[in-house]
Structures are given as structure tokens and as C-alpha cells.
Amino acid sequence: LLISAVQLQNLQASGRPLMVFDCSFDLAQPSAGMAQYQEAHIPGAIYADLDQHLSARPGDPAASGGRHPLPSREAFAAWLRSVGFNNAMQAVVYDRQGVNYCGRLWWMLKWAGHEAVAVLDGGLPVWQAAGGAVQSGGGPVPTAPGDFALQTPLRRLVSVDTVQAQLGSAAQTIVDARAPVRFRGEVEPLDPVAGHIPGA
């Protein structure tokens, strides 16, 4: 699940097939993630934008609802191929926000059936503190599309109906990863209703 900065540096030096994804994002300022990426990212990292790459676009088939609906598995796989990703690659995901956004890509890769994916422990701040190299500017341009093919999902997508039907059941655990003030309903900058799902 986690890879340390030193382990990633060793993996880079090994020459094994690897793709690193920068998932930096800011819900309040959607363009801020790309600006952060262009300012500094791990050399060779692909930028994975929550709105553009990790969510269904308006009018496209979606696998879920919500503010950032999941794209279909097929659309997600097409994006992975477009950035040169292959089934043989180790994926490493990171962000600058405490894994808020790279955790989504980790889950989506598992949902696409890809086993070899890890979260960079501590994200870019820890990478830099460990002496990891960074570069600025745009990302790499793939020399050829990847051949990523969907596999049997390693993670399950659960519907809202299923969650509602199992509220209060010991068989279901809901984890709310938002800020404590949003969980308690004291502040809600994005959603029309404040608070959390009962039992979370």
C-alpha cells in the first residue's frame, strides 16, 4: 500500500517499469493542482487531474454519481493507455494534501484490476525532505500509447442504495475522510447539506 521516498528512489534506479502520478488538487481552486504540478513534481510524473482524468466528464457515461462521479472503467483504462501506462508497470501515486486525492487514483487502479500500485508515504513534502529530485514545467509526452487492459476488479464499487440499505449494520463500515469540522457539520463549503452519513 505504501512506498517510502527511499524505496521509490531505489525503484527508479532499478530500471523496472514504473509510472509515477501526481494527483495534487484543491476542491476550492481546481486549477491550483496543475499550477502546483508545474511548479514542482517528481521527474517523469504524470499529472492526474481529479476533474479531467479521475472523474466522468459531463455527458460521458459514469460509474457513480456525486460531485466527482467515477468515469466508466473503460474510459479510465483509455486514459491510462493515453499516458503510456501498461499492465506490467508499478504505479506510484502521490499528492501534496495528505493522500486526499492520490488515494482515489490508488483505489481506481485497484478497481481496474491493477495490483501493483502504491501510495508515496508523506507525498511530495516527504519526498523533497528526503532529497528526492523535483522538476518544474509540463509533464512527459508519451512516445507511444500504453497497452493497459482491464482486469477483474480488486476493489468493489458500492452503490448509494447498498449503503443506505445497510445503515446501522455491523457488516458495513463507513469512513469519512473529510476534515473534522465538515464531519461534525460545523462548516460545509461545498455540499448543500452539512454533516455526515449516520454511523460514519
For the regions a protein language model found, what residue spans apply to each?
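Cytosolic catalytic domains that perform sulfur/thiol-centered chemistry
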Residues: 1-199
